[in-house]
């Protein structure tokens, strides 16, 4: 007899069957993979009991090495050994070369200005390199868990933009792995601590990794993780501490032009010194030169602190801005969570504690907390915990909008809006008979397009040729849970539509985002004045165009004196419209409107006469 398995739609017929999914912290310096096993989330070690994997890839003439093997050869073969590739994701070659000094790589530019690394295996891009880091982590997970993965959650800095997020997803796609979600690193940390402690209130997530810094202010309430505000710097991390010490030691030893191998060796030594100073008051730095000479120098904790103080203070300034954005005072923060290996630096903990007024939480290993949170989220998304009521609400770092006539920005989705989100706004045509409309999608807080960042352009065709202002075009902005944007424009009467997914060729650094926010505040008064001027100039152009068309059609209804008076008022508006005086333009528009009142009445009377011509009183 045949047996039928019956299950609820969308659920497995075997409820006990555990689906395999993992969380991956794809870090700048190190990467980790974690999974939920027997209800407990933890990172997965390799066969040598090492939990982390160095985010390093080496390309040789015989193959590709990743992780510890690549790290072992990085000093001897720096040109073919790519470290901290996360810092290059979604950035142009020009940005990289201007922002990061002393890079040993042989760069080439792709057709759209993105960086290519020339290696023994040919040219490779950051997406391909990131894929090589993911590969051993996924292999480790599948061998440990005993099966193929149904999906992964990858963590990214909260301030990663569309290009950086898409590049991260593409790295997994190269391996044929399904990405269940890109999860902001601070949010992942909140998941790990929130589920462990069950606390409710405002929490600050201070995430200082190898190459990026993020501060997120979250409200935890009944299973809801709402990000109130975010901030940070995608080009500031522990690597920068290493580079400062590296530069200081070169000066101490009077080395002006080190070879690539010596420079890489010293960078590795600088990192070791930094780590030792976490527990010791001083350590001796050592460097072996190409001629066999060994150099030494004692580095004290106070010296190291003096080198990095300005950078750590920059992170505290970001915390202050994030709190202001969230409308929260430092003493209202319930807990501060430290994330990232660089938070082990004593000066970092000291300044963070001083700012928030309380000792930060460190009960979960700061190196592993993000991966653990990602594993918990992966376990939920793959369907192993259908009863979970955990809800994540991330936010947009910058406003998204559309260019309107006069180079103005109409914001559709505001900064700090929770995502995923879909918002729509209606626009209309500017000219009679207009059958197409060009859309310019921009990002930023300023009032004029020239001061914002261009994201994409697309055109909607097939609009019915109606009078200006008669067509209704609904523009919908949709940002998914990964922070990727799609924009759709639809003409409501016909249903004709056009859309675009925004994948900019390269992204903004968090320093640039912070600069944009500061510029918007510093120029707010001037921007409003410029916007008012532009709005009046657009209105003047619209009035003149509409009136010119009316005169061409019904000018015979006017006497010569009446027409002359209107044309004189039009000439005044044309002259004033070219000036930078919004009030004068507004007054000229009002004067022209007053001079055309009789003309408008005559046109209305004439239209009624034409409509009633030939009809009897009884038929009306």
Curated annotation (Swiss-Prot):
Annotated Gene3D superfamilies: 1.20.1270.10, 3.30.420.40, Actin, Chain A, domain 4, Substrate Binding Domain Of DNAk, Chain A, domain 1
GO molecular function: ATP binding; ATP hydrolysis activity; ATP-dependent protein folding chaperone; unfolded protein binding
The keyword Nucleotide-binding is assigned to this record: yes
Domain of life where this protein originates: Bacteria
The entry's keywords: ATP-binding, Chaperone, Nucleotide-binding
Xref: InterPro entries: ATPase_NBD (IPR043129), Heat_shock_70_CS (IPR018181), HSP70_C_sf (IPR029048), HSP70_peptide-bd_sf (IPR029047), Hsp_70_fam (IPR013126), ISC_FeS_clus_asmbl_HscA (IPR010236)
Pfam families: HSP70
UniProt GO BP: iron-sulfur cluster assembly
Disulfide pairings: none
Coiled coil stretches, renumbered: none
UniProt entry tagged with the keyword ATP-binding: yes
UniProt function note: Chaperone involved in the maturation of iron-sulfur cluster-containing proteins. Has a low intrinsic ATPase activity which is markedly stimulated by HscB.
Protein family (similarity comment): Belongs to the heat shock protein 70 family.
The protein's name: Chaperone protein HscA homolog
Gene: hscA
